């Protein structure tokens, strides 16, 4: 298997299981990274330490290793006074990982969330998120990474912005991996199957879950994703962390962790490794148990409409609430109408836009909290306004026309 071949990676995940690497942050701290410092700073200041970490995973048998760039977006780096070094540190991270991988492994750029909330709860906008991730993906692509891996995201809208930034500015395969809570939803309330459907509809090559406690908690999440029929990526933690003698340890040893991952192989998982608390020893044990099993569970291939917190098969939509918006519509009145329907008994909400402003429809949808409660059908004779709204909608919307789009919208 040769690194630097995106076609090879996409072919491989269709035919076999690839082994991912494990945690890097914890191992960097053991190697001298001061607590609270930016891990990405080591890409430039201590590249040999980062190289040795990557090489340990390659030597353990990993097919795919990840760059040391998880908190490498500009927002996160600014917390360490390193915002102006965003491009430098990400490019350096890709270069050192490629050097360690050689011809023996693919290199995936690890990219995590900004830690910010979207409007109206925070200050992040879709366009700003897009620009932040565009900067990072271009830097790691310039450094030679083979794959883009967005991981540990909790907001479907943020990872959608990241995904589009990667797809529209590089030709690299993209993995999208979400983190889930104990209730088996993301922090923002999205179900596993909805995550898979939304992200695949926007062009993700592989979807999945990572972090999120340990293997025994994540199995139900992956089982729900498997029902969509998509190939999956999974990277659980080594159980739960605890502090012993002032040090963080995890409650699963390498053998137990690998044993618990055996049941994942028949759930369409094609990329599997570890997250927090795992080391090359965990990967060695996992490699001993690797197998390729055909998924034999039920597959729900029906087209779905998905909001941030609910989904419904198109065939099951019976009642639709309608809100008409024009350029003169008061935004607060529209919000009140949508909020009322969102908490009512309607299956979906149709927003009909009649106007010339290309951005108004998308702006209104982005700023209404209740918009995530019920799936949307978005209608407009203004194609540009409709496209802009679909682009920033955190789900799979319904549309009334055969308008070509790359945002997964379903004709209803």
Tell me what each language-model feature is.
Residues 1-412:
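Domain-level signal for soluble alpha/beta catalytic cores
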């Amino acid at each position: 298997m040769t690194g630097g071949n995106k076609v090879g990676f996409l072919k491989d995940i269709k035919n076999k299981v690839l082994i991912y690497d494990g945690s890097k942050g914890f191992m960097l701290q053991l190697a001298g990274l001061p607590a609270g410092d930016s891990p990405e700073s080591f890409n430039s200041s201590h590249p040999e330490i980062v190289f040795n970490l990557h090489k340990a995973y390659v030597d353990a048998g990993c097919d795919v290793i990840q760059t040391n760039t998880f908190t490498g977006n500009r927002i996160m780096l600014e917390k360490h006074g390193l915002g102006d070094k965003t491009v430098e540190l990400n490019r350096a991270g890709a270069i050192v990982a490629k050097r360690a991988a050689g011809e023996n492994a693919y290199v995936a750029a690890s990219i995590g969330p900004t830690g910010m909330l979207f409007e109206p709860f925070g200050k992040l906008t879709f366009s700003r998120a897009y620009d932040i991730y565009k900067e990072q993906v271009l830097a790691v692509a310039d450094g030679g990474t083979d794959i883009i891996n967005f991981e540990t995201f909790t907001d479907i809208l943020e990872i959608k912005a990241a995904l589009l930034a990667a797809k529209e500015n590089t030709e690299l395969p993209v993995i999208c991996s979400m983190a889930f809570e104990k209730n088996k939803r993301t922090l923002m309330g999205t179900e596993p199957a909805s995550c898979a459907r939304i992200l695949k509809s926007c062009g993700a090559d592989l979807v999945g879950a990572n972090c999120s406690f340990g293997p025994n908690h994540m199995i139900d999440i992956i089982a729900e994703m498997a029902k969509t029929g998509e190939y999956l990526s999974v990277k659980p933690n080594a159980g739960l962390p605890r502090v012993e003698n002032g040090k963080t340890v995890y409650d699963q040893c390498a053998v137990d962790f690998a044993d618990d991952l055996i049941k994942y192989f028949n759930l369409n998982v094609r990329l599997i490794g570890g997250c927090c608390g795992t080391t090359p020893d965990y990967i060695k044990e996992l490699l001993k148990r690797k197998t390729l099993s055909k998924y034999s569970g039920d597959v729900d291939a029906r087209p779905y409409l998905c909001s941030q917190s609910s989904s419904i098969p198109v065939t099951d939509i019976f009642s639709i609430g309608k809100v008409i918006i024009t350029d003169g519509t008061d935004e607060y009145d529209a919000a009140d109408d949508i909020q009322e329907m969102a908490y009512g008994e309607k299956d979906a909400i149709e927003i009909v836009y009649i106007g010339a402003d290309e951005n108004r429809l998308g702006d209104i949808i982005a700023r209404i909290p209740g918009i995530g409660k019920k799936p949307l059908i978005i209608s407009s004779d203004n194609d540009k306004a409709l496209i802009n709204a679909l682009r920033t909608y955190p789900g799979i919307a319904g549309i009334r026309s055969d308008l070509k789009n790359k945002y997964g919208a379903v004709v209803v």
